[in-house]
Regions:
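Active-/binding-site microenvironments in catalytic and ligand-binding cores
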Residues: 1-226
């Protein structure tokens, strides 16, 4: 079994979606100042970095992040590559083996954007007809490798359609170093009461293939993963 950490690092260099507050990490107490311990204050949006969008994000009466069943956030997931297009619609999604799948993670050209120092509006996204196709095929969770599943100048149509039809959205994934295929997704958002979203730690697990070595996180060369 291999474990892949598909969560972006939270740091002050993290790009944020336009209009969201920047992430700030400030020391409250510090050993270097003679305090008893290191304690920091974090200021951030509920939609910073790798995060989950529940229905409450676009509907005041929708389920909040703490009300989502964990069974929805843990289970088999298909990681599919969709490269060479910014607008991912029905035509592109029809090429994917989605029969019987409930969780879909889209690895797109967005993967390169995490290397940029600032937010980029030139990212791949779902179109309205793509969102409609996912609902028709029974997908319950869709993830993507940048900060929004919808185009930058979108009016929320894609978000609302997905969320109103029972899909939750996992945004801000780091899928670099992870090949397309079937995995077990474990996504644990912070349990924010009434939350319209929450940062999440997301990992993928796959079976170790015969003849392979130790299990390493693809985003670091330092520590093997149990």
């Amino acid at each position: 079994m291999k474990i892949y950490d598909i969560t972006v690092d939270l740091s002050e260099e993290l790009p944020v979606f336009p209009g969201d507050p920047p992430l700030r990490i400030e020391p409250v107490t510090a050993l270097a100042r003679g305090d008893a311990a290191n304690v920091s204050r974090i200021t951030m949006s509920t939609h910073s970095g790798t995060h989950l969008d529940p229905p409450r994000h676009f509907n005041d009466n929708g389920l909040s992040v703490d009300q989502l069943p964990l069974s929805l956030l843990v289970g088999n997931a298909l990681l599919a590559e969709v490269k060479g297009t910014k607008a991912i619609g029905r035509t592109e999604l029809e090429q994917l083996p989605l029969k019987g799948e409930e969780r879909l993670l889209l690895k797109t050209d967005n993967s390169r954007l995490w290397d940029l120092p600032r937010f980029s509006g030139d990212y791949s996204h779902l179109t309205p007809d793509g969102a409609c196709y996912l609902v028709e095929t029974g997908i319950k969770l869709v993830g993507i490798d940048y900060l929004s599943v919808e185009r930058l100048d979108g009016d929320g149509e894609v978000h609302r359609f997905l969320l109103d039809n029972g899909l939750v959205i996992l945004e801000g994934l780091n899928l670099n170093g992870v090949a397309a295929g079937s995995y077990e997704l474990i996504c644990l958002p912070l349990k924010i009461r009434g939350g319209d979203g929450a940062p999440a730690r997301a990992i993928l697990r796959s079976r170790e293939r015969p003849g392979r070595g130790a299990d390493f996180d693809p985003h670091t060369t330092r520590w093997p993963l149990a």
